[in-house]
Design a protein with these regions (language model features):
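Amphipathic alpha-helical coiled-coil/heptad-repeat segments
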Residues: 1-19, 25, 165-218, 378-464
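Sequence-specific dsDNA recognition surfaces
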Residues: 14-15, 29-84, 241-256, 270-299, ...
Length: 464
């Protein structure tokens, strides 16, 4: 169905270079004609809403620190009220697409814009404003010294041209996008499930190697670690504090511009998405290191996330290949000589579930690895030469799995990119979806993606 989409039959000039030609029966109005500021406060009884690039506007969980690290003040009386259907914009991150329609009555940060939005179909309006061409234009309408401090202004956004198809066309576009997003999301979920299965296979291989070694015939002994059981007799068991040096970090003042945009990589949890840290999103200056609580750690250090909502599921660890600074949610480890850092990272990945239970404080409102638990953890330590042998053996056994995971992750990236381009083409009138929308049934259809999960699971064996 998607492949059969064609342009509209007639177009006209939009009056905007970045929008180009638009369907001849669509209107173009400046955003100022469609929005009116909505000012209401002092409703702390309403649910707290937040805005994110990926989600749009959503009800914020007060217990899940992984959603947002911003501190919630005790007094919410000054928070703005957003009524269901209002347009909410995070003015400091509009250039990233952090905007959307409020799904229910709630309250938002005083730093957000809240507007009444006079458009026939608010779901269409949301899809339009969050599309790639419009997000880029909101960036142009923002002021600031550097990207991270861009601030959307009312003056800048008032003249943004808004495309207005007839109400029936808006409804058709929304219906088609809901269907196509559902189909693409189904394919993405199928690939994610296969990645999960592959990661489980990989973890089994790692766990066996770091807890029993490579030779199944060696005699065993009790480890003295309740969750671990027996280990090879010639391995030692030592507390981590006797084998590692630990270093924490901090955040230089965001208000001091002389601390930021320097040459020193500053690692925070958002950088910990790979096993090797070569660079970071944020950089700081030497002055920031000298005048704040952050610390420099040498190249070759093992970096670990110790405070983040992601610790509900996994323990991100990575090795730095350059000197870096850390924020307060990170910790670095350097070896005293008997425990190879690459091997210890492998041990963490192989025993992640058990270590999460050992290292995190049960009942804490913010997921964090307690240093006392971490430093006093008993770990089995093979001779240093055997550690390298285990690393080499595991790398060889898991290489085909790693390759398969990378392939599926790349396919997910391509599907997301395709979805982004499809939405942009549909909401800006490059593709006519009216006929396609008429053919859609009200119930969820599976069509060409219905067998994805089965096909992908069968593909696992072929990938290994």
């Amino acid at each position: 169905m998607i492949a059969d989409l064609k342009p509209y039959s007639a177009y006209k000039k939009s009056g905007s270079l970045w929008l180009g030609a638009v369907p001849s029966h669509w209107e173009v109005q400046n955003l100022r004609t469609l929005i009116r500021p909505y000012n209401e406060r002092n409703r702390p009884d309403l649910p707290l809403l937040s805005v994110a690039r990926e989600k749009g506007v959503f009800v914020r969980s007060l217990t899940d620190a992984g959603e947002n690290h911003n501190v919630i003040p005790e007094d919410l009386s000054n928070y703005k009220v957003a009524r269901a259907g209002n347009l909410v914009i995070n003015k400091m991150k509009a250039w990233q697409g952090s905007m959307g329609i409020a799904p229910c009555d709630g309250i938002v940060s005083p730093a957000y814009f809240v507007f009444n939005f006079a458009i026939a179909n608010r779901s269409f309006g949301q899809a339009l404003l969050r599309s790639r061409p419009y997000v880029a234009h909101f960036g142009q309408a923002s002021d600031g010294v550097r990207v991270g401090q861009w601030d959307l202004t009312i003056r800048g956004m008032r003249q943004i041209p808004i495309l207005l198809p007839p109400p029936d066309d808006q409804a058709a576009i929304v219906r088609f996008l809901n269907w196509s997003n559902g189909q693409l999301e189904k394919a993405i979920r199928a690939k994610r499930k296969v990645i999960t299965l592959l990661n489980e296979q990989k973890q089994v291989i790692i766990h066996r190697a770091v807890t029993r070694g490579l030779d199944p015939s060696v005699p065993l002994k009790p480890s003295g670690i309740p969750w671990l059981g027996d280990i090879p007799q010639h391995w030692e068991v030592r507390k981590l504090k006797f084998e590692m040096r630990f270093c924490g970090g901090g955040t230089p003042s965001k208000g001091n511009l002389s601390y930021w945009n320097g040459l020193i990589p500053w690692v925070s949890p958002k950088d910990m998405k790979t096993e090797i840290i070569r660079d970071t999103i944020d950089h700081i200056t030497e002055r920031a290191v000298a005048q704040s609580s952050t610390n420099l750690v040498p190249a070759g250090s093992l970096l670990m996330v110790v405070r983040s909502g992601i610790l509900q599921r996994t323990i991100p660890v990575a090795k730095s290949i350059c000197e870096v600074a850390l924020n307060q949610d990170m910790k670095s480890l350097t070896s005293k000589g008997r425990l190879d850092l690459d091997y210890f990272a492998l041990f963490i990945r192989g025993c992640e579930k058990q270590l999460l239970h050992e290292w995190t404080k049960q009942g804490a409102t913010v997921e964090s690895i307690e240093h006392h638990y971490l430093s006093n953890t008993k770990v089995p330590i093979p001779p240093i030469q055997e550690q390298q042998q285990i690393l080499d053996q595991v790398a060889g056994e898991t290489a085909p799995i790693t390759t398969a995971i990378s392939r599926f992750e790349r396919e997910i990236e391509l599907l997301r990119e395709y979805r982004t381009r499809l939405v942009a083409d549909v909401v800006t009138g490059k593709l006519d979806v009216r006929e396609a929308a008429e053919k859609l049934l009200d119930e969820v259809q599976t069509l060409e993606f219905e067998d994805d999960l089965v096909a992908l699971e069968e593909d696992v064996d072929c990938s290994l």
